[in-house]
Design a protein with these regions (language model features):
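Solvent-exposed, charged interface segments at domain starts and junctions
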Residues: 1, 5, 58-76, 146-153, ...
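A generic structural signal for short coil/turn motifs at secondary-structure boundaries
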Residues: 1, 94-95, 200-204
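Walker A/P-loop phosphate-binding motif and the immediately C-terminal alpha-helix
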Residues: 1-24, 29-31
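Short secondary-structure boundary/capping segments
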Residues: 2-6, 32-45, 100-102, 145-150, ...
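Conserved catalytic-core segment of NTP-binding enzymes
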Residues: 11-12, 111-221
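Extended hydrophobic secondary-structure segments that form protein cores and membrane-embedded regions
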Residues: 19, 83-86, 189-196
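P-loop/Walker-type NTP enzyme "switch/lid" segment
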Residues: 23-122
Length: 221
């Protein structure tokens, strides 16, 4: 869904940045048609989010910039450029790097929050729309994507109670934490989106679920 939205926005003339923050299950670049660009091969050599983090906490004076991580996806259909920052360089060490990240230390000892905020401001100046692919559920990485970085959280869910009440819990927690951020932020907006519409085949069940969605999620919008 995120890749489709990104492509449509670029087609409509918006300058778009897509960021893969799903570090545990990376690969947003695979959803873009390989005929548009060599995105899969680029990930073997071009750094991404994981590499930015390790550069930030590393001892080298020359630090990576997020601009060093940009992969441009080009198409004759796009009126503006579509840029991608992948989860990280796929060089054989990615999994161990992702597993060894200490998020508490990053934020509490390395001032990672201010580093993120600086990048966030630069992204906003450079692009019309920034779309961030997040890990599902309540995780350290998910907190970055639902609390620290976004102005709007799009919550994809399915027609079952676990999914419905799960996204409700996620956004309620995110809003509480969002209000405590030491940065200037407007109210965190939420857009719940059911990922499947089965009204054509299961009309009555679909109608019941839509009523339930409206009732349970009315506080979100």
């Amino acid at each position: 869904a995120l890749a489709n939205v990104a492509a449509l926005l670029a087609k409509w003339g918006r300058k778009v940045l897509v960021i893969d923050f799903d570090l545990e299950a990376p690969g947003i670049e695979k959803y873009f048609d390989s005929s548009l660009s060599s995105l899969n091969s680029f990930r073997n050599t071009v750094p991404g989010i994981i590499d930015l983090i390790y550069s930030f906490i590393g001892s080298k004076k020359e630090k990576l910039s997020w601009k060093d991580c940009i992969i441009k996806c080009t198409s004759a259909h796009f009126r503006k450029e579509l840029s991608i920052i992948t989860a990280g360089r796929d060089d054989g060490n990615y999994i161990s790097k992702a597993q060894n990240l200490n998020w508490d230390k990053l934020f509490n000892e390395n001032d990672f929050g201010n580093y993120l905020e600086t990048m966030r401001k630069e992204w906003i100046k450079e692009y019309d729309i920034i779309l961030i692919d997040s890990r599902t559920g309540i995780t350290d990485i998910g907190g970055i994507c639902t609390i620290h970085l976004p102005d709007v959280v799009v919550l994809m869910f399915t027609t079952n109670d676990q999914s419905l009440y799960g996204i409700k819990d996620v956004i309620e927690r995110a809003r509480k934490q969002h209000e405590t951020l030491p940065f200037d932020r407007s109210t965190l907006l939420a857009i719940p989106v059911p990922s499947r519409d089965e009204s054509r085949t299961e009309y009555e069940a679909s109608s019941r679920w839509k009523k339930k969605f409206s009732k349970e999620l009315s506080e979100l919008y």
